[in-house]
């Protein structure tokens, strides 16, 4: 047994190999060429096979989620190019290929170039929908970029002439395969944009092998399509063929005939629609005329047509009423505005010290006026009461009695009113008050009304 060497289990060694392979970026995205053997298509959709060459072989699996996109059926003995990742299947301790894509060998280099260019252009945004231009609703000037001798031009031209004969077609002849084809196609697209006047471009060719269609997978053609200000329909190959040009073009057609159908409307269908719209317009016009005629007849029978002068007078009266209402409304608005202004001024004055002082002074003046008025009224009431009291006193006043010939006797010294002879003595001096003065008298004789003799005069 080795001195200090660690002793590993099979699982530990297998796990170490798995991590080592997973850390190698080359093995996580690798392209491999080989021959298929031991091929088995499982009922669940997965494909199991061995990929081998003259010197080695490797187990491989392609899960159903990936192999459903294959456009061919893998078989034993078929040479293929596979893209995938290498990893270790721990239970068996063996490494194997987990395939993601597969193509028949012979076109492997082209397919690899296709995938790399597609990925790069997609990252640049050449395939984004927001960059695509809408097709014109009716294209009258159409340029066709294709071979002048191929089936594509015949299919496109015959379809457009059948569907929309008024369209003007211009053929821009190009090479559609070979080394010079990409330059020829890109140049024609640029020339069409420089010349101008075209509503639409159709760029394409008929079907063929991937090598024959390869010009439409070149970056030069893709960028010419992307830079075109004229909308472009791509029509390359058959329905199952997809080229880089299809992804960049504004619209992709499955076939050249399909491109022609997308480019122009069907004139017969347009005529049919026009006829339908014409009939609908006629019916609508007839219905409108009918309604207008009925309306006119109602107007002719109306009061306005029969008595126009009265109607004018009535409208003048209504106008006067409206003007009066408007004037009142205007005055009311002005009055309301003045009221609001007064309220604001009042509120402003209330919160302003000068306004408060003036308000207090006004209140004082008002209070003073009120007090004077109240005092005046009180004096008037008191005077009235006094006059009433005087009148009452006058009714009881001795003066009134004296006016009838009576006099009031008073003692001269004490001014005591004499009500009885018993209050007087002989030789007392008396004052007799009459209405217009008084008399000074001396008592010489005293008689009692009882007829008796005078009382003691001492």
Swiss-Prot record:
It catalyses: Exonucleolytic cleavage in either 5'- to 3'- or 3'- to 5'-direction to yield nucleoside 5'-phosphates. GO terms for cellular component: cytoplasm; exodeoxyribonuclease VII complex. The keyword Hydrolase applies. Keywords: Cytoplasm, Exonuclease, Hydrolase, Nuclease. GO terms for biological process: DNA catabolic process. GO terms for molecular function: exodeoxyribonuclease VII activity; nucleic acid binding. Its EC number is 3.1.11.6. It is an enzyme of class 3 (hydrolase). InterPro entries: Exonuc_VII_L, Exonuc_VII_lsu_C, OB-fold_nuc-bd_dom. It is found in: Cytoplasm. It comes from the Bacteria. Pfam families: Exonuc_VII_L, tRNA_anti_2. HAMAP family: Exonuc_7_L. Belongs to the XseA family. Heterooligomer composed of large and small subunits. Bidirectionally degrades single-stranded DNA into large acid-insoluble oligonucleotides, which are then degraded further into small acid-soluble oligonucleotides. PANTHER family: EXODEOXYRIBONUCLEASE 7 LARGE SUBUNIT. This is Exodeoxyribonuclease 7 large subunit. The gene is xseA.
